[in-house]
A protein has these predicted regions:
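Bacterial Sec-dependent N-terminal signal peptides
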Residues: 15-40
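Recognizes extended acidic, P/S/T-rich segments that occur
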Residues: 68-69, 73-113
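Beta-strand-rich modules
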Residues: 109-124
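Extracellular fibronectin type III
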Residues: 124-141
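Repeat-based blade/solenoid architectures
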Residues: 152-162, 171-182, 236-247, 328-334, ...
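Acidic carboxylate motifs that coordinate Ca2+ or other divalent cations, activating on Asp/Glu
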Residues: 191, 256, 283, 419
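Short, conserved, GDST-rich strand-edge loop motifs in beta-rich repeat architectures
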Residues: 199-215, 264-302, 468-471
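Conserved small/polar residues in nucleotide/adenosyl-binding loops
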Residues: 508-509
Length: 510
């Protein structure tokens, strides 16, 4: 059996010009000095057990039982799977311990009967988790959740301008409605079962394009076990709809066993408990979107407060807030962000992440980012006891000029140097766990990257990424480099094109 690592790149040519009833809530002030002690991560989980079954293939393939490997499990952990049929005794299914995977195929399952599966450590009588698989569940391989259609804005007569079909829009002239795009899962209420938070919006604007459609970006939480609606957060008119504008994170940030939601907000954001951010800056206005159709920034938001809000997973209420990375002086936008006040494209490129910068066993930090085409800033914050505390703030200006223009549309987080603390791969550069620059390859901006153990013959992790500008990447339009040092391992010429996509896959050949 031979294993072949394949790197695939795609050359894609891109052109970019590069109320009276308000309940006003205030946000905490962030101290400059972070707390030294962080709470240990608490895990309350039933292993996320799941049984997958394909009714089309039927019993030929059996049922696949899968579960999560937990961070406290020993490296040599081995498991047993037991099954009870129609309330009978539990019988072990595997003939030898399951020690190389976290799944097991039950080839003998009878889908006409109720099957209850238990996961145990090999040789143990104590259940780590269980899952009930019924004949009704076997009838389909997916679960339907009905979206909450109540209290949505009236969009009657609004049609799609047809500029963003690639983001899931249906094209020019199509009626506009609230469609689901991104989603994230997490245990919002601490019961050991996952919930899902979905983003709904009427249109996905690219920051390069001016324009306006009615509607605002919504984040909604649903239970996965029964599809019950939990809460809705309406980001409001000052957070423009679009993939680049509203990334969000669902993660247990304070180690209490319940996941929070972190997202960029502004005045007029409405939370799940009905609270609305009011006129926080006292300027007498709460609506900042440019509504001048003749402006190059029509439909964009270039003024007004911006925040990072932490939202309770159970209620959807805001529990902490701080200022987002500021836009800065408008006169400096062109030189710093790469475009001006009347365009507002590169300034409004946002990313978010989570990293364990203290240790892998401590509560994580939330990471907010702004910019990547030219200068950019990254801030890591810790959330504990209802407060946000700044851990570090990275800025390419003035000390990291070799990091300018090195960001991607995406990032990756992992312990790349083996110190037990996470680093951030930010396109063609890396930021250390302490917020200091680790390295920059200088190969420039790109649209895709992957962090992983791609070369088993080398120590540590590798990064596979593609790049946009031939003047930057030279002979390395697609390349793999050492994640800890930035050393180029090998590269592929881009033939003078924008290499818009890349992928890594492992193929097995006989």
């Amino acid at each position: 059996m031979r294993r072949i690592l394949i790197l695939v790149c795609g050359a894609m040519l891109f052109w970019t010009s590069c109320s009276d009833d308000e309940v006003v809530s205030s946000g905490p002030v962030i101290p400059e000095t972070p707390e030294e002690e962080y709470p240990s991560v608490i895990t309350t989980d039933n292993r996320g057990m799941m049984v997958s079954y394909d009714p089309v293939k039927g019993q030929k393939l059996g049922a696949l039982i899968s579960w999560k490997w937990m961070k406290d499990d020993p490296d040599n952990a081995a498991y047993d799977i037991y099954r009870s049929v129609d309330g009978g005794e539990f019988v072990k299914l595997n003939s030898k311990p399951i020690d190389k995977s976290t799944n097991y195929k039950d080839a003998s399952v009878d889908i006409s009967r109720k099957n209850v599966y238990e996961l145990r450590f090999a040789g143990s009588g104590e259940a780590l988790g269980s899952y009930t698989f019924t004949p009704e569940m076997a009838a389909t391989f997916y679960k339907s959740i009905f979206l909450n259609m109540n209290d949505l804005p009236d969009l009657t007569g609004t049609v799609n301008p047809g500029e963003n079909e690639e983001d899931g829009d249906e094209g020019e002239g199509a009626s506009v409605g609230y469609k689901v795009s991104d989603a994230a899962i997490g245990d919002l209420d601490g019961d050991g079962q996952y919930e899902i938070v979905v983003k709904r919006q009427t249109y996905s604007w690219d920051p390069a394009n001016a324009g306006y459609l009615p509607g605002t970006c919504l984040l909604e939480a649903y239970r996965l076990d029964n599809g019950a609606f939990m809460w809705r957060v309406d980001l409001g008119p000052n957070i423009r709809q679009g993939t680049h504008y509203n990334p969000f994170i669902v993660y247990d940030l304070d180690g209490d066993g319940k996941a929070e939601l972190a997202v960029r907000t502004s005045e007029l954001t409405k939370f799940g408990d009905g609270t609305i951010i009011g006129d926080v800056d006292g300027d007498g206005k709460t609506h900042y979107m440019n509504m001048n159709p003749s402006s190059g920034a029509y439909g964009k938001v270039v003024d007004g407060p911006e925040f990072l809000s932490i939202i309770d997973g159970v209620t959807g209420a805001e529990v902490a807030r701080t200022d987002y990375i500021p836009r800065g002086d408008k006169l400096l936008w062109v030189g710093y962000w790469g475009d001006g006040y009347d365009y507002a494209n590169r300034i409004d490129r946002f990313l978010m992440a989570v990293g364990h910068f203290n240790s892998q066993n401590s509560a994580p930090s939330i990471v907010m980012c702004r910019g990547y085409y030219k200068n950019f800033q990254i801030v890591a914050l810790d959330y504990a006891n209802g407060k946000l505390t700044k851990r570090w703030h990275f800025d390419t200006y003035p000390d990291y000029q070799d990091y300018v223009e090195q960001g991607n549309h995406n990032l990756a987080v992992g312990d790349v140097d083996g110190d037990g603390k996470d680093e951030i791969i930010y396109g063609a550069c890396a930021i250390d766990h302490n917020g200091k620059g680790l390295y920059s390859t200088g190969l420039g901006h790109g649209d895709a990257l992957h962090l992983g153990k791609f070369d088993p013959t080398r120590e540590g992790l590798q990064v596979v990424t593609c790049h946009e500008s031939p003047s930057k990447y030279g002979n390395n339009g697609l390349e793999m480099h050492d994640a800890a040092t930035g050393e180029i391992i090998f590269g592929v010429s881009g033939d003078g094109d924008d290499i818009g996509r890349c992928m890594v896959c492992l193929l097995y050949t006989s």
